[in-house]
Amino acid sequence: MSKVVVVGAGIGGMSAAARLAKNGHKVTVYENSDRSGGKCRTEWFGDSAFDTGPSLLTLPAVYRDLFLKTGKRIEHILNIEPVDPAFNYNFSDGKSITFPNLSNPATYLEIKKILGDDAGSGWQQIIERAERMWDVSREQFVESELNSFWPLLKNRNLVTQLREIAPFTSLRTLSNQLNLDPHLRMIVDRYATYTGSDPRSAPAVLLTIAFVESTFGAWHIKGGIGQLSVALQNRCEELGVKFEFNTRVREISVKSNRVDGILLEDNRFISSDLVVANADAEYVYNKLISKNVRSANNERRKLKKATKSLSGFSLLLGLDNYKGERARLNHHNVFFPENYDNEFEEIFNKKIPVSDPTIYICAPKDKSMVIGENKESWFVLVNAPRHEPGIGWDWTQGGEDYAKKIITKLDNLGLNVSSRLDFLKFRTPADLESYAMAPGGSIYGTSSNSAKSAFLRARNRSKTKGLFCVGGSAHPGGGLPLVGISAEIVANAIGKA
């Protein structure tokens, strides 16, 4: 039995903790805040509950597997429901496309109806190409440790597979090569933002998101996606995992190139055989590990080379429909601007708040997330530059004015927000940096803005012996499915007690 310390009670940390405890290890989780979940939280304000982090569950099989292998099935604990339709996309020219859930044929028909036969055929091409990419990348890239490119060179099918995933082709370039309808190109571009990236430079393999969403579906957890955090903490505790909340880790201690424990802010030293870091990798290697630890230098250099992911500016809106007419929205809604490229230019190059942002609205059709038939809870998110005072945008100022600007745009879209507004709370990238310990408020750690980006993420198994990294800033990346896979990779690397 190994004594394992997990730094951070996010989804990745708890998923790893549950698997390791089931494998016979003694596990303790240390969390800086007063609750588990990291960015994955459902929070109540007044009469409304909001998913303040992830608001969509894809690839639920990742968590079905986790719960099945550690105890009771997830279906016995959580009510996981398909969201139908999956998405509603709205464009500045007045066109609107609704993607049905779990039905590619129905999606093709919807696209043909709105955009014409060529567009429908184009989307079918997209899904077929995305499926082939997924088949190539899933096992050897996504579900395996990815420590270097060299082992991949031994693959006999490497040339064919590289041609399929097109590692040196950007998502935007692939859209252009396929001559996609401009409306569909915007939808494809948006997949880059799922990893905090710019579609003009992010690799084409992110197209796999289209296949995963359409084939494995879009799902909601009754009561909010944050219920997954609650269920994971409960599962961990059932398996004997201990939690210490409001406990800040000051340092991961390393002696002779091997971790030997952690030093807490209250000066307690906790010895351990292994440390699983669920904090942002940039924070782990630059703040928690001494600069004198040479084995960490390679990771520091990689992280320095990587482009940081974008952040987000969010609004939590509690709406009262007795005050005005209810807007007709689906669960997941996207409103694109006229000039989508300008958004990426302002975020990544100018590093300023987007003047005319794409707006995502999560408007759950979940009665357990509001008190009162007349109430609605909307989570509104726009992409934003990181919080970087001195070299970029300082998000400690101007948040209220930017929130008002977004509400005005929502009103101009005919969504009747101002007259129905019962509650408003906004969160800036600076807030995200503060409560999630995410440098600059980056949602996904590093972006995927180059062909080498996958190799610039933190390795799951560090060169510092006994140290493992899990979560959105480590391989294979951000988002609930990948974070769950990250935890499985780490648990398998550590093995049974």
What are these regions (language model features)?
Residues S2-V136, S448:
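N-terminal glycine-rich phosphate/pyrophosphate-binding loop and immediately adjacent elements
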Residues P54, G472-I494:
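A conserved FAD-binding loop/helix module that cradles the flavin
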Residues S92-A202:
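Rossmann-like flavin
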Residues L162-L171, S214-N234, D394-Y402:
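Short beta-strand to alpha-helix junction loop
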Residues D181-T195, D356-C362, N416-P476:
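A glycine-rich dinucleotide-binding beta-alpha-beta segment and adjacent secondary-structure elements
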Residues T208-V259:
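Helical element adjacent to the flavin cofactor pocket in flavoenzyme catalytic cores
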Residues H220, R250-G372:
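Mid-domain catalytic core of redox enzymes
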Residues D320-P429, E433:
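C-terminal segments that line or cap access tunnels to active or ligand-binding sites in enzymes
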